[in-house]
């Protein structure tokens, strides 16, 4: 995300200021002209016109919210949060920062790090219309598509959880189909041929290939979304389902399968490792080389 945004800003003579809890990660952007802000979110909130954030969980977002409001923030600061968090957390943060004069929107992103690098992310954008109009060019610089989810920021994170439910369900479906094929004499290439012919979309083709190839380890050259992150996100959608009295049976199954992988020490594998749980339940080996 940040590399594409910096490239966009450079074209108009502007620069990106960046911060990361792990400063070495932020420093990678210095080579393309970004400025590393070592003094953290408070300094960014005081000096920047637009602030983007991408944080792991609700606790991290709330902590940054405390720092932004204590800065104090620059007058009319716009903050666009791209994190996957619980909608009530987005609503809470929005109310707090807005009480300090900050204009807040949510635009959580669909896509892994490799998609971000290739500018293939999809954003679920929600906030006041004039704000969205003003910052849309920045978001377009980081995405291939934007889904407009209205004026309430928490609807952006609701959209993200609904979207992630689709993705998690696809992973479970592929895992079960591949296991059934394995046990019934079909080759995994047969499964991939069906996917590529009948269901040619990036999510199903990508995870179908990854699962069929037992390509579950994550590395800098082979990015993915880890089991630990999957548990967090599926946990959020299950919480929202409980709160709204909605049955998400597939989410319950996926959560159980991810928990099994975490218990086996596979927390850093891609969440496509759901297939290992399905295989084990079906009487097949549930291990793969990391």
Regions found by a protein language model. Give the residues of each.
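NAD(P)+-binding Rossmann beta1-loop-alpha1 motif at the extreme N-terminus of oxidoreductases
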Residues: 1-53, 73-78, 83, 92, ...
């Amino acid at each position: 995300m940040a590399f594409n945004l910096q490239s966009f800003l450079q074209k108009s003579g502007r620069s990106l200021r960046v911060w990361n809890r792990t400063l070495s990660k932020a420093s990678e952007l210095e080579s393309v002209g970004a400025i590393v802000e070592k003094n953290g979110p408070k300094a960014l909130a005081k000096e920047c016109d637009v602030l983007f954030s991408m944080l792991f969980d609700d606790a991290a977002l709330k902590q940054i919210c405390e720092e932004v409001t204590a800065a104090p923030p620059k007058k009319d600061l716009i903050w666009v949060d791209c994190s996957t968090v619980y909608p009530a957390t987005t609503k809470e943060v929005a109310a707090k920062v807005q009480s300090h004069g900050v204009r807040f929107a949510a635009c959580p992103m669909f896509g892994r790090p490799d998609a971000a690098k290739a500018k293939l992310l999809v954003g679920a954008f929600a906030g006041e219309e004039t704000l969205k109009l003003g910052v849309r060019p920045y978001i377009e610089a980081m995405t291939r598509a934007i889904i407009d989810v209205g004026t309430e920021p928490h609807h952006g994170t609701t959209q993200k959880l609904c979207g992630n439910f689709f993705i998690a369900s696809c992973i479970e479906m592929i895992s079960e189909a591949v296991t059934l094929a394995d046990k019934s004499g079909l080759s995994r290439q047969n499964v991939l041929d069906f996917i590529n012919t009948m269901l040619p979309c990036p999510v199903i083709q990508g995870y179908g290939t990854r699962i069929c190839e037992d390509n579950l380890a994550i590395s800098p050259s082979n990015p993915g979304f880890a089991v630990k992150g999957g548990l967090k996100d599926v946990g959020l959608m299950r919480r929202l389902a409980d709160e709204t009295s909605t049955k998400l049976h597939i989410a319950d199954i996926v959560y159980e399968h991810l928990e099994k992988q975490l218990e086996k020490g596979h927390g850093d594998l891609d969440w496509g490792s759901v297939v290992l749980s399905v295989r084990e339940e079906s009487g097949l080996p549930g291990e793969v080389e990391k």
